[in-house]
């Protein structure tokens, strides 16, 4: 193998590993810590979030309650590349995108009919034990909401 090919291969492996380890911070099962969270009036509440690798993609499954207290379950599969991917089971959005900013910081956006209904940031603590999601949006009745949800890794 030529030296140039070796260098290109090593750089490619390094970039792939960096992306995998960055995503690894988000992976796992996360339970809502209601005592540390600030759930705004009219906000949906995700009690459990499961983030797992599925092939080359990431699958995020959320279980919780809507603003009226009814159980919710939604699933999203895609990449942390900022592109929109379909979400199933979320009455407030039909697509969602996640963008990885660095190893522990992510941006999220949800759209319904092409219109942004929710956006925010997700931060994983340096020790990897806490995940904080700060989101703002508009619910199905047009009401505004803002939530800071703190999750503990299980």
Where are these regions (language model features)?
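Hydrophobic small-molecule pocket/channel-lining residues, especially in calycin-type beta-barrels
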Residues: 3, 21-154
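Intrinsically disordered, low-complexity terminal and linker regions enriched in polar/acidic
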Residues: 1-7
């Amino acid at each position: 193998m030529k030296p140039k090919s070796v260098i290109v291969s090593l750089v490619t492996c390094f970039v792939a590993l960096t992306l995998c380890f960055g995503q690894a911070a988000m992976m796992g099962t996360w339970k809502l810590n209601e005592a540390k969270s600030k759930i705004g009036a009219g906000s949906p509440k995700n009690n459990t979030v499961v983030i797992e690798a599925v092939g080359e993609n990431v699958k995020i499954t959320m279980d919780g309650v809507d603003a009226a207290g009814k159980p919710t379950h939604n699933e999203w599969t895609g990449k942390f590349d900022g592109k929109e991917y379909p979400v199933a089971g979320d009455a407030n959005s039909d697509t969602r995108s996640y963008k990885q900013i660095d190893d522990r910081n992510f941006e999220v956006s949800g759209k319904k009919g092409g219109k942004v209904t929710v956006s925010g940031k997700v931060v994983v603590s340096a020790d990897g034990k806490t995940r904080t999601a700060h989101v703002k949006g508009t619910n199905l009745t047009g009401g505004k909401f803002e939530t800071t949800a703190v999750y503990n890794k299980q």
